[in-house]
Curated annotation (Swiss-Prot):
<feature type="topological domain" description="Cytoplasmic">
    <location>
        <begin position="377"/>
        <end position="383"/>
    </location>
</feature>
<feature type="modified residue" description="Phosphoserine">
    <location>
        <position position="442"/>
    </location>
</feature>
<keyword id="KW-0007">Acetylation</keyword>
<feature type="modified residue" description="Phosphoserine">
    <location>
        <position position="425"/>
    </location>
</feature>
<feature type="transmembrane region" description="Helical">
    <location>
        <begin position="187"/>
        <end position="207"/>
    </location>
</feature>
<keyword id="KW-1133">Transmembrane helix</keyword>
<feature type="topological domain" description="Cytoplasmic">
    <location>
        <begin position="308"/>
        <end position="319"/>
    </location>
</feature>
<feature type="transmembrane region" description="Helical">
    <location>
        <begin position="217"/>
        <end position="237"/>
    </location>
</feature>
<feature type="topological domain" description="Cytoplasmic">
    <location>
        <begin position="208"/>
        <end position="216"/>
    </location>
</feature>
<feature type="transmembrane region" description="Helical">
    <location>
        <begin position="384"/>
        <end position="404"/>
    </location>
</feature>
<feature type="modified residue" description="N-acetylalanine">
    <location>
        <position position="2"/>
    </location>
</feature>
<keyword id="KW-0256">Endoplasmic reticulum</keyword>
<keyword id="KW-0444">Lipid biosynthesis</keyword>
<feature type="topological domain" description="Lumenal">
    <location>
        <begin position="124"/>
        <end position="186"/>
    </location>
</feature>
<keyword id="KW-0443">Lipid metabolism</keyword>
<feature type="topological domain" description="Lumenal">
    <location>
        <begin position="57"/>
        <end position="72"/>
    </location>
</feature>
<dbReference type="GO" id="GO:0106258">
    <property type="term" value="F:L-serine-phosphatidylcholine phosphatidyltransferase activity"/>
</dbReference>
Length: 473
């Protein structure tokens, strides 16, 4: 019996590995202030599920076959999300509630299974499914068939420039602001922005709407829309990095206004981590990981345009913008999990959301290739090879610039935004490269300096004035 117990004892490395992986895959909520929202309600959900199924099964009118199928699909999705709340991991985020991120992961699993299902259909069946969802898609036309691109580029007038500031320019701006919040690196954001414009050039022979005038690509897209969004997102990142996170309990707030503000702040991050994608002492594996990150990012963007071109629906259709919003939701935990896997030596496997996101990206590409064989038969392999080499070159150029900046202007001291309801520890280093020897300016783990520094920080937090749930000095 003793030998059996001893064989189950985990080593220190196993404990550290499980702790690091849990922080990105099963983040826990500490210092819970309202127990009701975090207490398990499995019996309640079971009773609700059984009663609701009995009600809809015996009371609704089932005379219309199409309504039966549609409502059956919605019910399957709804109850699958309930199972997601009960069984799936929280992921790296806990705000506004872990149940929300469990449902996001559940939706990503459903979308993954839907893509697998599409692979076993033919093109006519897929189109029939689309027409069943929206009969108006029978009359949809490709944008490339009714519009001209890159025409009279030498004619540059103020009226023509202003006409390009449409809803898509607005989407570019806010889209890049959100991307900057996720990536949190000027170098990588600008590299992805420039690389995407080059991607459009290399795939212009397949998608005519990628053709743009030079001033549209350089000035309007890269500098104004993308650049403005990157700047706004990074300003918000710097603001969140500089804040001191010390969340107060609802019980400690005695004013109605304070409780309302604290409830609103529940939808803000519990903490904010300064990221460092590349370190001068990082190994080649870190460089290859960032290159893979950029390839998957570009592939996900390409899928957006290939899907609507092959299956013929407008960019304004819900099939297009709902997919974009959905991909944006699952990208947030994916980037956090991939960054931890790439930079933390103790995290030796990717998170589940990151794994599912990668599969979704490649499955979408496979779906496009299967149902767009006529389109991809025109592919020029030389352009694809040049595109891969171009992405590799820009990646290495970006990383070299980041290393040069770090060596000449010094390393920025890493800051930890702590929160009382998180399990984040300042003793855990997030920016050691995989296979790297470690950075000299990073403090050793479990040192007295770290303990005293953490103690001083907790003392400082305990003395801070609590206002609307956030401690301010």
């Amino acid at each position: 019996m003793a030998s059996c117990v001893g064989s189950r004892t985990l080593s220190k490395d196993d404990v550290n590995y499980r702790m690091h992986f849990r922080m990105i895959n099963e983040q826990q909520v500490e210092d819970i202030t309202i127990d009701f929202f975090y207490r398990p309600h499995t019996i309640t959900l079971l009773s609700f599920t059984i009663i609701s199924l009995m009600y809809f099964a015996f009371t609704r009118d089932d005379c219309v076959p199409e309504d039966n199928i549609w409502r059956g699909i919605l019910s399957v999705i709804f109850f699958f999300l309930i199972i997601s709340v009960l069984a799936f991991p929280n992921g790296p985020f806990t705000r506004p509630h872990p149940a929300l991120w469990r449902m996001v992961f559940g939706l990503s699993v459903l979308y993954f299974l839907f893509l697998v299902f599409l692979l076993f259909l033919n093109f006519e069946q897929v189109k029939s499914l689309m027409y069943w969802l929206d009969p108006n898609l029978r009359y949809a036309t490709r944008e490339a068939d009714i519009m001209e691109y890159a025409v009279n580029c030498h004619v540059i007038t103020w009226e023509r420039i202003v006409s390009h500031f449409d809803i898509f320019a607005f989407g570019h701006f806010w889209g890049w602001a959100m991307k900057a919040l996720l990536i949190r690196s000027y170098g990588l954001c600008w590299t992805i922005s420039i690389t995407w414009e080059l991607t459009e050039l290399f795939f212009m022979h397949l998608l005519p709407n990628f053709a743009e005038c030079w001033w549209d690509q350089v000035i309007l897209d890269i500098l104004l829309c993308n650049g403005g969004g990157i700047w706004l997102g990074m300003v918000v990142c710097r603001f969140l990095e500089m804040r001191t996170y010390h969340w107060a309990s609802f019980k400690d707030i005695h004013t109605t206004t304070g409780k309302i503000k604290r409830a609103v702040l529940q939808f803000t991050p519990a903490s904010w981590t300064y990221v460092r994608w590349f370190d001068p002492k990082s190994s080649f594996q870190r460089v290859a990981g960032i290159y893979l990150f950029m390839i998957i990012w570009q592939l996900t963007e390409l899928n957006t345009f290939f899907l609507k071109h092959i299956f013929v629906f407008q960019a304004s259709h819900p099939l297009s913008w709902c997919r974009i919003l959905f991909i944006g939701c699952i990208t947030a935990p994916t980037v956090r999990q991939y960054y931890a896997y790439l930079t933390d030596t103790q995290c030796k496997r990717v998170g589940t959301q990151c794994w599912v996101f990668g599969v979704i990206g490649f499955l979408e590409a496979i779906v496009c290739i299967k149902f767009g064989q006529d389109l991809f038969s025109k592919t020029q392999i030389l352009y694809v090879v040049l595109w891969l080499l171009c992405v590799a070159f820009t990646t290495f150029l970006c990383l070299y610039g980041m290393v040069w900046y770090a060596e000449h202007y010094g390393h920025r001291e890493k800051t930890y935004s702590e929160c009382e309801d998180g399990t984040y520890s300042p003793e855990i280093s997030w920016y050691h490269g995989k296979g790297s020897k470690g950075s000299e300016d990073s403090p050793p783990k479990h040192s007295n300096n770290n303990e005293s520094h953490s103690s001083r920080r907790r003392n400082r937090h305990s003395k801070s004035k609590v206002t609307n749930g956030v401690g301010k000095k």
